[in-house]
């Protein structure tokens, strides 16, 4: 079976608690795996790509125990796993993935409102973040 790390997955309620600082185990750094050209709508408190680099470099030197939340475009976005592994190899250990991603968050925002599911901007076309359909399934 060998050595393999277990990926820490969290749901939308935990993300809400992180945003509202209702987590008992400290503050979180929130990052995403969306393309640089697709950063106009993010979950509240997400660092910009520039802030992410600077903040990660600072924590890399000073505190690898920082809590890091990663999310992607949707539940099929494998870039979150790549980012998780990259950070793990750098020595970070408190890494969590919000599997639902921005798509789930926006769907919940559409139903329950901006106060419960805040983003940096309002998006009308939620399906922009649904991902590509699987061509193998008919």
Question: Which ranges hold each PLM region?
Answer:
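Rhodanese-like catalytic fold shared by cysteine-dependent sulfurtransferases
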Residues: 2-16, 20, 24-28, 33-69, ...
């Amino acid at each position: 079976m060998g050595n393999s790390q277990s990926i820490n997955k969290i749901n939308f309620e935990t993300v809400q608690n992180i945003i509202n600082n209702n987590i008992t185990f400290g503050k979180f750094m929130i990052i995403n795996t969306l393309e640089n050209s697709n950063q106009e709508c993010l979950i509240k408190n997400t660092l910009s790509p520039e802030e992410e680099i600077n903040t990660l470099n600072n924590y890399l030197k000073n505190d690898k125990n920082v809590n890091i939340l990663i999310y992607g475009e949707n539940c099929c976005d494998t870039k979150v796993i790549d980012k998780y592994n990259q950070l793990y190899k750098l020595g970070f250990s408190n890494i969590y993935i919000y599997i639902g991603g921005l798509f789930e968050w926006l769907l919940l925002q559409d139903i329950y409102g901006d106060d419960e599911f805040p983003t940096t901007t309002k998006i009308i076309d939620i399906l922009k973040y649904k991902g590509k359909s699987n061509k193998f399934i008919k």
